[in-house]
């Protein structure tokens, strides 16, 4: 059975309070849906969230027991070379997910450092983006 680590970045824990582009769902419901979907695929999922860059880096550095990472680094996608550097040390598939379409957001959100290393980027599909990422690991 494949084991995948899902890492969610800053402010996703208050998803229901975010801008109108975001799904109006509580974070705990997002996590429940991700886990429920993964269970139907036979993939074991561990979901973590942090508002702190260093904690996200430590999660990546300790991820060797996983077969892949699904990461929504949120605003850190556009700013964190440190997270990019940590991801470069993970030699297994990495799928970047964004709930909103970052290409249709503010100009400063249209670039993602994570995309440089990601096996695939899924953007603008809402919660279904996580399901699509899980499906990539079934292949």
Where are these regions (language model features)?
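Short beta-strand elements in bilobed, periplasmic/extracellular small-molecule ligand-binding domains
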Residues: 31, 37-48
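N-terminal small/polar loop signature for handling phosphorylated ligands or for N-terminal nucleophile
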Residues: 51-90
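Extreme N-terminal starter segment of soluble prokaryotic enzymes
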Residues: 1-5
